[in-house]
Amino acid sequence: MAPTVKTAAVKTNEGNGVRYRGVRKRPWGRYAAEIRDPFKKSRVWLGTFDTPEEAARAYDKRAIEFRGAKAKTNFPCYNINAHCLSLTQSLSQSSTVESSFPNLNLGSDSVSSRFPFPKIQVKAGMMVFDERSESDSSSVVMDVVRYEGRRVVLDLDLNFPPPPEN
């Protein structure tokens, strides 16, 4: 099943042709493109372009970066794997904000270099509680508690109905 794509090109009654999502015409004839960052709730300037189609494509690239396959774009994007994901690889030429999504690389080297958090060795019989505050000024609190109790094994399969009660 092909993904549904929402497009936003709209015919206007003013005779100016087509209007695109995230594109506005400047008084001197060029077209400006911008988009709202869904995470920071701020506008991201994508640049000015000679044609409305160029500006709309810049908007589409960034919309796919921010929202993925659920992005509302100006142009239909049928081949998600080849076309849309290649759009996310390159930023527009006049972008002033870095992408919110880092490249996905699950190798252990990149994880340890990008996330320099302390590593804690946990042995069997220990529980680690990690409590994080919502405040920007507080630090992480780690409690390590020694657990000496015995394990209880439940023979439980959630695919079957519960046993009858006595």
Curated annotation (Swiss-Prot):
Compartment list: Nucleus
Predominant location category: nucleus
Record-level GO BP terms: cell division; ethylene-activated signaling pathway; phloem or xylem histogenesis
Keyword tags: DNA-binding, Ethylene signaling pathway, Nucleus, Repressor, Transcription, Transcription regulation
Any Pfam family: AP2
Cited SUPFAM superfamilies: DNA-binding domain
Protein's UniProt keywords contain Magnesium: no
Its biological purpose: Involved in the regulation of gene expression by stress factors and by components of stress signal transduction pathways. Transcription factor that binds to the GCC-box pathogenesis-related promoter element. Acts as a transcriptional inhibitor and may regulate other AtERFs.
Annotated family: Belongs to the AP2/ERF transcription factor family. ERF subfamily.
Protein known as: Ethylene-responsive transcription factor 11
